[in-house]
């Protein structure tokens, strides 16, 4: 798989450059490898032949991220029937991911992306504003990836409660 590369012009980064590459329907998902909450290496290629719901969330155990993760957990039996694997990604460390998983009985891989490289590849890292301040962080995003690694649906700035319904909509469910 050919990874998507985000470039900086002349080694600088201004407001225009902060717009990361975004994925859209039909694009090849970038290949990646991250560590999950159990310390196990997980690669997107491990799921070849299955659909994958890949979603990015800002911080484990916050209200929106908990709502999003629990909605994915609650769709587990339906996802199993549809042969969809779920992968959550955040900049949190492995220990924080493990606590999040245990606290909410999520039982699907939560991947640690502390240097946000995978988030950048997917366009899920960008400028955010809170209380009048600008900073870089995770843009809550989700992607439905088909069995061959192609994007079936991409949602940026998705509301936590819409992650599962939007994925199901693409599948006609």
Question: Residue locations for each model-derived region?
Answer:
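Chalcogenol-based redox active-site neighborhoods
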Residues: 3-6, 16-173
